[in-house]
């Protein structure tokens, strides 16, 4: 564009076409039908010089404006590209600063080696394995926080009512067991006994005097009638049921003795007419 404008400026300084110059001695009485325009060799007038100067100034000004516009557009493009690059660098710097602040605020935990070649933070290992590490290899001892292990078991032992030095292993260890020091035949009931057992009366053994009187009656009558049963119960301060049960047990005992001595499998025959 600039080269074209300069060429046009150069062409403006050339004389216009179809102009014929003539000497001063020639006359101007030629025919008006001549295709050429005569020009005298006299110096140019003031008006033609001013017009040529104005035309030259116009094209010079136009060329300068074009150069300024081209340089301005290139400057704008370069400025926009530089501003974009500055924004990108500023964003990257902000990201690096944020990453640095996060890295500085986060605690740095040194990794610990394990038997498999992997690394694990010590805090995570102590939280995941709160038990005794003595049963495991030496590499495993490095992952367990011994102070945390001691606090865990000491707190558990202090919170419980376990009377021994070692901690409880079962949740039902706090259950109080009943005392078994006393005699079980003293009529005391355990906690897990049912109510039906508590309703049963205590077994009372027969005294020697009662046993002697019952043995005398058994020598005469193996089976006792209701009247005799009532008399014995009243005399010996027993119930009729106790008298009846004693005679049943005594007959069974006598039957076994006779079977051992005589070998009779049937035993003693029951006398007729007795209950």
Curated annotation (Swiss-Prot):
Residues 44-53, 70-89 have a biased composition (Low complexity). Pfam families: Homeodomain. Its main location: nucleus. Transmembrane segments: none annotated. One of its GO terms (cellular component) is nucleus. SUPFAM superfamilies: Homeodomain-like. Residues 199-258 bind DNA. GO terms for molecular function: DNA-binding transcription factor activity, RNA polymerase II-specific; RNA polymerase II cis-regulatory region sequence-specific DNA binding. Residues 22-31 have a biased composition (Basic and acidic residues). Keywords: DNA-binding, Homeobox, Nucleus, Transcription, Transcription regulation. One of its GO terms (biological process) is positive regulation of nematode male tail tip morphogenesis. Residues 250-259 have a biased composition (Basic residues). Residues 1-53, 70-116, 250-275 are annotated as: Disordered. Disruption phenotype: RNAi-mediated knockdown in adults has no effect on their F1 progeny, but increases the frequency of posterior morphological abnormalities on a homeobox nob-1 mutant background. However, RNAi-mediated knockdown in L1 larvae causes defects in tail tip morphogenesis, which are exacerbated on a nob-1 mutant background. It is found in: Nucleus. PANTHER family: HOMEOBOX PROTEIN ABDOMINAL-B. Probable transcription factor, involved in posterior embryonic patterning, morphogenetic movements of the posterior hypodermis, and cell fate specification. May regulate expression of transcription factor dmd-3. Belongs to the abd-b homeobox family. This is Homeobox protein php-3. The gene is php-3.
């Amino acid at each position: 564009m600039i080269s074209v404008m300069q060429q046009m400026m150069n062409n403006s300084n050339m004389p216009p076409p179809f102009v014929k110059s003539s000497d001063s001695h020639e006359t101007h009485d030629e025919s008006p039908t001549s295709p050429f325009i005569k020009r005298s060799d006299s110096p140019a007038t003031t008006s033609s010089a001013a017009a040529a100067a104005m035309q030259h100034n116009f094209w010079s000004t136009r060329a300068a404006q074009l150069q300024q516009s081209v340089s301005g557009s290139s400057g704008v493009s370069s400025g926009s590209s530089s501003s974009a690059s500055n924004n990108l660098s500023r964003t990257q710097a902000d990201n690096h600063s944020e990453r640095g602040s996060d890295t500085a605020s986060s605690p740095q935990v040194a990794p610990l080696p394990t038997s498999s070649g992997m690394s694990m933070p010590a805090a995570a290992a102590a939280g995941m394995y709160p038990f005794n590490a003595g049963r495991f290899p030496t590499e495993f001892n490095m992952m367990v926080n011994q102070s945390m292990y001691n606090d865990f078991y000491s707190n558990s032992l202090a919170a419980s009512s376990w009377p021994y030095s070692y901690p409880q292993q079962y949740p039902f260890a706090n259950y109080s067991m009943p005392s078994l020091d006393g005699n079980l035949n003293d009529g005391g009931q355990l906690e897990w006994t049912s109510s039906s057992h508590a309703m049963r009366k205590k077994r009372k053994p027969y005294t020697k005097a009662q046993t002697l009187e019952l043995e005398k009656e058994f020598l005469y009558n193996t089976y006792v009638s209701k009247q005799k049963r009532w008399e014995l119960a009243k005399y010996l301060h027993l119930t009729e049921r106790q008298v009846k049960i004693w005679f049943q047990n005594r007959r069974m005992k006598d039957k076994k003795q006779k079977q051992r001595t005589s070998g009779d499998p049937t035993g003693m025959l029951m006398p007729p007419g007795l209950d």
